[in-house]
Amino acid sequence: DFVKSLGTPRSWRNACAALAVGLAERRRRRIDAGRCNGEWFANSVGIGLDALVVGAADRVRWLPGLLAYPAALALVLRRGVDAAQIRLEADGHVMEVPASMVIACNGAWFGGLFHIAPPASLDDGLLSVVIASPLSRRRVLTLVPRAIRGTHIAAPEATLFTARELVVETAAPLPLEADGEAAAPVSRMEVSCVPAALSLIV
C-alpha cells in the first residue's frame, strides 16, 4: 500500500535500480508520518470494520498474496457489520455520528487492493479521513468493487475530509489497526499528522 502511494516500482529489481540511482544522485523526499495514541504509523490507522478485517486476515495468512483481505472480509461479514455511535473532533470541529469505520490515511491505499482515500498525499501535512456510516452485508459487497477503484467516496454512506488532528471517542472499545497490524481495542483514538517526519531515498 505504502509503495503504491510513493510511486516506487513494484518489481524488486526495478525498485533496487531506482534505489541505486537515488543513492548515486543523493535524491531525497520528505514525507509525512502519523501518530496514534503516541505510536507512529506510516500509511493508515483505523477503528471498526477495517480493523476487524485486519484481525481476521491473521487467520487466513496461508492464502496467497492479495486473497487474504477478501477472505478476511468474508469472515467478518458472516458475523454482520457492527456500527457504533462516535464522537469525532477534527481540527476543532465536532460531529457525532453512527459509523461502521473511521480510518485516517496518510497514504491512499489499504489492504493491498483498496484505493480507500484517493486524494491522500504523503507530503501535504494532512490526513485524509474516511468515515463509513452503518452498512448492511449486501451494501458492503456492492461497495467493495467501488473501493478497489476509489469511487466509493461518492457513495452516500461515505464521508471524506482532511484534518491535521483527529480525536475519535466511542462508548465501548472498538478494534484498532495501524498499518495493517491489529492492535488492542480502544475507546479513544488520538491521531495527528507529523509533516515531513520521514526522509526517503527516491
Residue ranges and their predicted role:
Residues D1-F2, V102, S128-V130, V140:
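Hydrophobic alpha-helical segments that either span membranes
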Residues D1-S100:
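Catalytic core of DAGKc-family lipid kinases
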Residues G46, I103-I116, A182:
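Glycine-rich phosphate/pyrophosphate-binding beta-alpha loops
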Residues R59-A68, W109, L113, P118-R139:
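Gly/Ser/Thr-rich active-site loops/lids in small-molecule metabolic enzymes
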Residues D82-A84, P98-S100, D123-S128, T162-L166:
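A generic structural signal for short beta-strands and their flanking turns/coil linkers
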Residues A90-D91, S121, I131-V202:
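ATP/nucleoside-binding phosphotransfer catalytic cores, i.e., glycine-rich phosphate-binding loops
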Residues D91, S100, A104-W109, A132-L135:
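Histidine- and/or cysteine-centered catalytic micro-motif in compact active-site loops
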